[in-house]
Amino acid sequence: MRSDIPETLQNFVSTKTVHQTWAKTFFCKPQAIFQPRTVDEIRELVDQARINGKTIMTVGSGHSPSDMTMTKEWLCNLDRFNQVLKKEEFSGPTRNGEGEEVKFVDLTVQAGCRIYELNRYLKENELAIQNLGSISDQSMAGVISTGTHGSTQYHGLVSQQVVSIEIMNSAGKLITCSSMENTQLFKAAMLSLGKIGIITHVTLRTIPKYTIKSKQEIIKFDTLLKNWDTVWLDSEFIRVWWFPYSGNCVCWRASKSSEPLSKPRDSWYGTWFGRKFYESLLWISVHICPHLTPLIEKFVFKNQYGDVETLGHGDVAVQNSVEGLNMDCLFSQFVNEWSTPLSSGQDVLIKLNDVIQTAREQNRFYVHAPIEVRCSNLTYSEKPFVDENDEPSLYPNKKWLAKRDRLSPGPIPGNNLRPYLDNSSNLRYDGDGANVTNDQLTLFINATMYRPFHTNVNSQEWYQLFEDIMTNASGRPHWAKNFIGVNGAHRTDQDLRKQLEFGGKTSYSMKGFNPILKKWFGENLVEYNKVRESMDPDNVFLSGKDWAVRNGILIDV
């Protein structure tokens, strides 16, 4: 029995005393870590926090490598609140008009359910998530709270699959929101940054299971630039890994399939030896001989992928949907990902390449590979579906569903609304997505710097130049990553000290985007803060306030 914890919370206080990021870049020792198992326990935690003047930080897997989840007060982890509660099937006419088939299945899950746990349930029930990011470790609440996305010309953020959300405010009241109900709250909750309330339940739109048939080609960097106008529109899913010192890229393109699984692709660093050897080489390049970095990249690329361009005849594999859409993130890392209109992509990559090669020639700094290049369709109609009577609905009508079969590209969305804090460039919506153009697509560029054996690498100069180029291309940072930010009055010694208190280092400290965030988000930031204040007048969920202030999230409304 802990004397510093209210009696009503004793049954679900954890024995854990430390919270740290997955990459071990930051850690904190909260006053207490709670793992509620029921809605009543979550409500009691919120009530006691309000009564005792505490703040609550809600965390899942800790994959955000910045200090955004660090706190000295109360921390809530929902890993024990992780059940699938409801399964609702929806059928529609087959494409040939001869009968009906299951088109989608809406699942209501407790928000602590990890994506890998949900994937197990889906596999058992012959279902699948429509679009995934690079990993499946996040919680259901976490995957939608920071703007997780995949890489596809048709799909948007993972939150596009969300039909409705239940969220608890600082008074302990559960509120349901969707594209039909409490829409302002819904647009805030779909990318909440944990500052709106505690998400308790999510209804997610899933579809019948599918496999992923992919073609993986080795292409030159110049080939990517030459084929820029067509490469992104060739398949439903696409991602590119760029290895700047070798001048190579891996172009992975894939579509839904019903074909049986094939033998997995060979992976040199997928073996125990290859993985440890690669990480050891990185350690040497980071701490002893930085100038070896280009040679190490070329060595690893040749062993993993070969050294022959295979455009038009790459190797083909069929995987289950999770293995196809997820990827091996390898080692502890800093990640700095930004979005920009895809139409700016060629110019951006050329400028980044110039910076990388110049820095190598001058022995100033070296970058790690791959640099991940992805795209998403973040255009939204901002309207609910309509039913057969042209009335607003949470569900697409049967006429729309009749155009699709199980392998049709693109989503059956859970909603068509843009979250207030969506960090894309707000490109123009142009129809129902049947004929996508590059002008509708947002490019994501992710600059990874590995931390071999959890040791630090100095990424500051590279990341600052990277951010300058992205900013000049109308870019914006991914909320959950290691961005640096801009100089300004918000940058104080006190804020830096707080980052260092949580285990951070000056070499990867964050300045934040306080001076320019309101310009970026305009009225959407105002609306987000209106929702935040209405949901949390007691500031129970204003944990991690330093990160929020540093980045200009909080404004007076």
Curated annotation (Swiss-Prot):
Membrane-spanning parts: none
Example of a GO MF term: D-arabinono-1,4-lactone oxidase activity
Cofactor: FAD
Enzyme class per UniProt: oxidoreductase
One Pfam short name: ALO
Pathway(s): Cofactor biosynthesis; D-erythroascorbate biosynthesis; dehydro-D-arabinono-1,4-lactone from D-arabinose: step 2/2
Entry's family note: Belongs to the oxygen-dependent FAD-linked oxidoreductase family.
UniProt-recorded name of the protein: D-arabinono-1,4-lactone oxidase
